[in-house]
Amino acid sequence: MNKPLRNSHPLFKIANNALVDLPAPINISSWWNFGSLLGLCLIIQILTGLFLAMHYTADINLAFYSVNHICRDVNYGWLLRTLHANGASFFFICIYLHVGRGIYYGSYMFTPTWLIGVIILFLVMGTAFMGYVLPWGQMSFWGATVITNLLSAIPYLGMDLVQWLWGGFAVDNATLTRFFTFHFILPFIVLAMTMIHLLFLHQTGSNNPIGLNSNIDKIPFHPYFTFKDIVGFIVMIFILISLVLISPNLLGDPDNFIPANPLVTPAHIQPEWYFLFAYAILRSIPNKLGGVIALVLSIAILMILPFYNLSKFRGIQFYPINQVMFWSMLVTVILLTWIGARPVEEPYVLIGQILTVVYFLYYLVNPLITKWWDNLLN
């Protein structure tokens, strides 16, 4: 009997097994839409970024004006730029919801998938940071100076490392050129890592909202989840385009409309909104090296979840106290985001320190509470 081409062609077979005939749990909710939304975000970012790179000039005397030229003189350049800048925000909204879903439903028990996911998160954060430097406005320059300077906290190697990264004794033309190079190449590395992420996920199959084995009750990915994903695409693209066409600079920093000036420091240096929670954690530790360690750990701590799971059930659907803790942690992250945008003065410093302790305690206490709850029900 003749097989359909998608089952016989060596190339189509790979795509078919990942996107068409993939057995998917029948009961996965809309929280499982964010993986495909992240894929869409990545494609949007790569395409808009590619066209922006055709008109951008990575030179400290020209970068700011080349971005200005893109917005004023290039056909639909303003649309490309605002889509790219706001697309990054939507990328992070989706990635944080995706991670939150993984924590809530215990998806971190797919250990290799989870660990690669955390590495992808680090890569995306690095890409976004370097992209923020490229327009060479005030916040670009000072953000780059402050964040790259953190490497100087590394004992013995610190200062040499920073100067090696800068390509000189300060953030200068060499820094901008290499940041542009890395900003261009990293999304393709993220794309490759995403393929590996999916490869490992498809070894085990998807998790589902009740955390039980769903092998006895699966349906093909297409048409059921392709259409469900398309609904998600339409909603996200609608919100993104609405933001881009109504208020494209809502999430940006006004200081970045001023060309970079090494002689004038902005009153308040801060990164884009999606890094503010980590920035608040960095600032809440009075010691420089301690702050850098806390900053890295704020994301890296996600890697301990698969190895520190003490519960009998997968996820926290069946653990009421843990659910309260989870939503409290979400509020903590939102408050940290707010603190990151505030000046370094009381009461903000103290609030930031308390929230930082609460943030890290969640990851340490959460498994213990599940264990206690299991013992209670025995």
Swiss-Prot record:
UniProt keywords, alphabetically: Electron transport, Heme, Iron, Membrane, Metal-binding, Mitochondrion, Mitochondrion inner membrane, Respiratory chain, Transmembrane, Transmembrane helix, Transport, Ubiquinone
Name the Gene Ontology molecular function terms of this record: metal ion binding; ubiquinol-cytochrome-c reductase activity
Name the reported effect of residue 357 to I.
In strain: NC37, NC48, TT00, TT01, HW00 and HW09
Cofactor binding, note field: Binds 2 heme b groups non-covalently.
Listed result of changing residue 71 to Y: In strain: RU259
- Location within or outside the cell: Mitochondrion inner membrane
- In which domain of life is the source organism classified? Eukaryota
The cofactor(s) it depends on are: heme b
Question: Which InterPro entries does this entry report, sorted A to Z?
Answer: Cyt_b/b6_C, Cyt_b/b6_C_sf, Cyt_b/b6_N, Cytb/b6-like_sf, Cytochrome_b, Cytochrome_b_C_euk/bac, Cytochrome_b_N_euk/bac, Di-haem_cyt_TM
Q: What does this protein do?
A: Component of the ubiquinol-cytochrome c reductase complex (complex III or cytochrome b-c1 complex) that is part of the mitochondrial respiratory chain. The b-c1 complex mediates electron transfer from ubiquinol to cytochrome c. Contributes to the generation of a proton gradient across the mitochondrial membrane that is then used for ATP synthesis.
What name does the UniProt record give this protein? Cytochrome b
Tell me the gene name. mt:Cyt-b
